[in-house]
């Protein structure tokens, strides 16, 4: 391969040699080196520094391991649109970023150190542990940086933001202070999802990312009523899917407006095999209280209603016997409910509107330590919060039966005990979706403890309003997945009881827990402390040691760190160190809000949410305007990639096999961006074959024939804004001529019909691709370009091959201009191969033009060069050619065998001028193109009965009706059915003697008349006259000779322009054909001399043709 950085001088006019084959992975590395030597990315930023800003926000990856193929997906899209906008002249500052804090990093370090949880970290020490976390981040960044360069993702790595940098942490503090000042940040004792392995709460958007299907017990238990009208003779039938929480049962909730009934078990008849549940009990004690709508569903047969019923509101404050007395219930201050004091410290019926009658029994077990609704309800009744579960998820050792057991494993022994004591009424196992930690896979527990919350519910309407002015791709996300999330928004549990994260900037008065000070910077903290802290590391444990005294009271920092999602959600301003770092105000204000963000679809409940939430909370405006959601990456068989299945494909080996462009094109163009993608070697290779290699082969073709003819384009290919001279656009900087050496390209209006068609098609492509990219629709871009490349190669180039061979200026100029435009259009999606082409075709021939395709201007469509009429006529011509090929295939007539004529409908022929008719004649290899009036003139019809349809109408008479159809004139029958839709036929066996036959009752087939091959499709017909005259036969033989000689040239390794002498030996018939067409053969194969000679042993032989030749280069 030639030098990728050619010497650029005015004497460098010729294309570089472009080989027909290309090693895409090897090319990648050459182009990466070229960009590095020429500082191409930096130059693209410099060239557009005064352009209109177009802001792209990089969602920071967590550098805690090796990057996967899914990381390539997001980076492809995050590279395409900034490249596109840069070529349009926008200033796109592409700042990289790294998400450094949080559980992902901590868990990776714990694994490296062999730790099993927080106690190990505390023993090891927070300072050395956080140092390990910092080192882990910097170590894994190298792997992501390698991927970024290898795939051609242009992003500013040198000035990347790090969420662990002190300036970034201070910016997050500043944002929290704004939220604090608005009264939207505070501490509360709530039930929140909690990971016992990681020892910290999770936010609602983290919770949504970790649901898995689990098989758990669903149990019905009986609580004896101890007060009220049913005391001592009925039991509350309570349903729960968390048996382990029954140890902490505090109340039973009912709906105030639901009617509850008393059900009695029917006596078991003597001699019956039926076994009653808990049959040892007194029958009277079997009375169960259940919601009336659920009686049949839960109890049903074998149970009867006693006639007693109560509204839920009437059952309020009834006491009952709890299932376990393992714990000591704390004494609480009794409250008054509707003028009545609560009857006990715990275990009585309470009212709750959230109780439903869709599942369960209508009576809901309450354990306020483990349920947000439970906690809210029980607080209203002054009930205690009883929690025997330790932070590691195990029961306290003092709890009988389950002490020391993990909460999920305690279900089994508790259910067995309930059954043994007659408390269990029914146990069923069911599958349901249960939350797990999205990072470590541990079962989560809803756990009551104090946490810091951002009150996002207070800005719900603002968030919904911001969503309305945001453009989502796909649009369904706006009011679907994301809109639903906002509608059901709950407060953000922002604190984490961990170590490696942004410390919460909150200092609490040791003597008054309600007295809390929020600081926005180290500078402000310095004022409280009385010494300069601006140079310190704001992480734990250093920041924990900072205390200060105010009004005689000592303040210590609260121990929690912030949710890492707060870090990433703050990046629009924190990446600049806003507002503390000098110059950050200008940078932030010129880049906010962002024009474009892009990540996988699960970020609707992650980064997309926190970015909108933080922007709205801090600035009253969302952080972004347009967001593209991406589908997930799957293995080739449709399964999720996992180490367990052994189907993980690492991105760099994929690119080393197929090239970065192949993977990029596949990600961008193979399906809509938001659809899941099946990635595999075969699917990627198909991309290479269908698009990239076809594009490359077309480039190689242009170079081959341009060099063979000594042709070179002018100094600039878009020479004139005059539409008659080319695509329009850039006027070259050179003065005195429109072309290199004074060469002026032929006017478009003066070019061949194929050239004019291609100029029009290229401008249409520019228009459509630009529109699609402006709408972030890479699938449409891919389809448009793939179709264009196919038409360029398989229609324009093939039909123009003779003109290229002859050095036709119009053809060479047109393909040169087309390839220049096409290369620009493809550059954002496949930057490597387009750069290779740019260097070999356009840098070498235009020393004053852009030195990289990525420094070139985006093409603009010239509407004056779009010829819709010509496009329609060319489409018709191509359809006729396809039909003609089909007719040849049906008749098994080789394309090299000339035929006398092809017939098409007169209406179609009238739409084709002589130029296009000539193209059709040449492509179909026919001597003449004529018209016919009706396709029926070329075929014979055959008709027979459709027995399936006839049988439904005529039953036993069907054979007689079918016989009548077969006896009818098929031409008449086909015509009548086509015109009238039905035909009445004489059939005595049918009632009334007449059978009405419709088109469904008849199978009409067409058979071309002898000597013709006819193909009809969508109202267009092509008929080929198959008669082969002796003259046509010899012409066909001559073409076979040309084909064999050309093959012999290739096998001899000759260049396309090499002249030869041709010695030949053939049978008498073939010799006549060769001699008759000698001039044509010699021109096609570049033979300066042809001679008939006796065959020698070293000659090439074609036995089927009866031909032997010897090719010698002159």
From Swiss-Prot:
Transmembrane segments: none annotated. Its EC number is 6.1.1.5. GO terms for molecular function: aminoacyl-tRNA deacylase activity; ATP binding; isoleucine-tRNA ligase activity; tRNA binding; zinc ion binding. Pfam families: Anticodon_1, DUF5915, tRNA-synt_1. GO terms for cellular component: cytoplasm. It catalyses: tRNA(Ile) + L-isoleucine + ATP = L-isoleucyl-tRNA(Ile) + AMP + diphosphate. GO terms for biological process: isoleucyl-tRNA aminoacylation. Disulfide bonds: none annotated. A motif ('HIGH' region) lies at residues 61-71. ATP binds at residue 643. Keywords: Aminoacyl-tRNA synthetase, ATP-binding, Cytoplasm, Ligase, Metal-binding, Nucleotide-binding, Protein biosynthesis, Zinc. A motif ('KMSKS' region) lies at residues 640-644. InterPro entries: aa-tRNA-synth_Ia (IPR002300), Anticodon_Ile_ABEc (IPR033709), Ile-tRNA-ligase (IPR002301), Ile-tRNA-ligase_type2 (IPR023586), M/V/L/I-tRNA-synth_anticd-bd (IPR013155), Rossmann-like_a/b/a_fold (IPR014729), tRNAsynth_Ia_anticodon-bd (IPR009080), Val/Leu/Ile-tRNA-synth_edit (IPR009008). Gene3D superfamilies: HUPs, Isoleucyl-tRNA Synthetase, Domain 1, Valyl/Leucyl/Isoleucyl-tRNA synthetase, editing domain. HAMAP family: Ile_tRNA_synth_type2. PANTHER family: ISOLEUCINE--TRNA LIGASE, CYTOPLASMIC (PTHR42780:SF1), SOLEUCYL-TRNA SYNTHETASE (PTHR42780). Catalyzes the attachment of isoleucine to tRNA(Ile). As IleRS can inadvertently accommodate and process structurally similar amino acids such as valine, to avoid such errors it has two additional distinct tRNA(Ile)-dependent editing activities. One activity is designated as 'pretransfer' editing and involves the hydrolysis of activated Val-AMP. The other activity is designated 'posttransfer' editing and involves deacylation of mischarged Val-tRNA(Ile). Monomer. This is Isoleucine--tRNA ligase. It comes from Cutibacterium acnes (strain DSM 16379 / KPA171202) (Propionibacterium acnes). The lineage of its organism: Bacteria, Bacillati, Actinomycetota, Actinomycetes, Propionibacteriales.
